[in-house]
Amino acid sequence: METRVAVISIIVQNKESVPDLNSILSEFGDCIIGRMGIPYHKKSVSIISIALDAEQSTIDKLNEKIERLSGVQAKTAYGNI
């Protein structure tokens, strides 16, 4: 099946959700191209960008799992590639 390039932008407000988030990201590690995390101390949040190359259904599943975490928001942007 065809894969798509996408970026999931994540904002973590609840630091207690970080271990679960890392576990989810490890589960999808084979489709992750790269990851960048930035702690924003002024607002007490972490901002994470995940670059992916995967089937649409896999990207959607990852985004849904992330959004189920307490204090974590995620949005996905798709490339036309």
Please give the residue ranges for each predicted region:
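Long, contiguous binding/interaction regions
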Residues: 1-81
